């Protein structure tokens, strides 16, 4: 294992799938039964407000989660559905919820089309079965069917009145369309997958962009939110210091990746074998994707080039300039 220290992560130890947990006076959470190496215990869908409700990240297409949300929202009106990004553990149930509650969807935009030249081939090892027994294609699967009713830009006020004020905060990096959502009344940022309390975030090219991700982390660190509520894992009530630590961690990881290339390890998997030697083997594939993100950034920064002048794909070889 490298000497790159990780920030202090936290666990979410007490919860029940499908139950409604009142986590603050204005926020409820329902956790989907889709645990995996990407999703931790599962997708946390947030219900904001009472009576007139805003839903954040409806979650995956699981019957059990749909039924839990239907029960949680019985007798209430959904005024808006906010989606952080278009991975399959976040947005698919938006279509059902939109039809069921006649509520508009908001997001930065649809996911851009795939880039066949850069996309790695499908890997069956990235499929997991949730503890529910329902097959789940984990986060790296993309919901290309989702398109919002209303596309937002950074700073848009999407909900106002009824005791709720919510704004869009565009945070590209994990995906190009990733957007966090604020709740002004509780000085809260719903951070999606941009910041997670239990782990670092996978930043996988081509749509994931490490340079944009680090810039977005700095943006969030400077906002002054009191609490972060990620879609996976526990809240962080040390928002600014924790996100600043994530920036430091990413920069240290980048330096370690560059050092490994200079030492003769020229591919993402070779680098992972060293930098993640103490990490469980099943996490090496997602780790390789973030290492790939660092390699692409280092190419863009002029620190590395691709052997043979090829595209900086997951299988490419890199050398220092």
Residue ranges and their predicted role:
Residues 23, 100-101, 224:
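Short, structured coil segments at secondary-structure junctions
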Residues 1-9, 259-321:
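C-terminal regulatory/interaction regions
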Residues 26, 69, 232, 257, ...:
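Residue-level signal for inorganic ion chemistry
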Residues 53-55, 60-62, 140-150, 164-254:
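Metallo-beta-lactamase
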Residues 14-76, 180-192, 197:
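Conserved beta-strand hairpin/beta-sheet module of binuclear metal-dependent hydrolase folds
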Residues 84-90, 174, 232, 294:
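Histidine-centered divalent metal-coordination motifs
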């Amino acid at each position: 294992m490298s000497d790159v220290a990780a920030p202090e992560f936290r666990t979410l130890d007490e919860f029940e799938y499908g139950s409604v947990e009142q986590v603050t006076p204005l926020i409820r959470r329902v956790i989907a039964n889709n645990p995996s190496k990407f999703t931790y215990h599962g997708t946390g869908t947030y219900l904001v407000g009472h009576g007139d409700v805003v839903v954040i990240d409806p979650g995956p297409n699981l019957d059990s989660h749909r039924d839990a949300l239907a029960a949680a929202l019985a007798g209430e009106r959904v005024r808006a559905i906010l989606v952080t990004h278009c991975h399959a553990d976040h947005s698919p149930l938006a279509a059902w919820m939109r039809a069921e509650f006649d509520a508009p969807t908001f997001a930065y935009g649809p996911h851009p089309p795939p880039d066949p030249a850069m996309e790695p081939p499908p890997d069956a090892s990235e499929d997991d079965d949730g503890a529910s027994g329902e097959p789940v294609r984990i986060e790296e699967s993309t919901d290309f069917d989702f398109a919002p009713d209303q596309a937002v830009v950074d700073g848009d006020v999407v909900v106002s009145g009824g005791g709720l004020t919510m704004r869009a905060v565009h945070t590209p990096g994990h995906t190009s369309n990733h957007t966090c959502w604020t709740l002004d009344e509780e000085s809260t940022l719903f951070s999606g997958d941009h910041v997670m309390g239990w782990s670092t975030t996978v930043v996988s090219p081509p749509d994931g962009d490490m340079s944009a991700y680090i810039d977005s982390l700095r943006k969030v660190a400077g906002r002054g939110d009191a609490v972060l509520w990620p879609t996976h894992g526990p809240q962080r009530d040390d928002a600014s210091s924790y996100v600043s630590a994530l920036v430091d961690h990413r920069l240290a990881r980048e330096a370690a990746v560059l050092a490994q290339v200079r030492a003769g390890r020229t591919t993402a998997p070779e680098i992972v074998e060293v930098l993640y030697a103490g990490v469980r083997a099943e996490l090496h594939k997602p780790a390789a994707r973030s290492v790939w993100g660092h390699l692409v950034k280092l190419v863009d920064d002029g620190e590395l080039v691709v052997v043979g002048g090829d595209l900086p794909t997951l299988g490419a070889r890199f050398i220092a300039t």
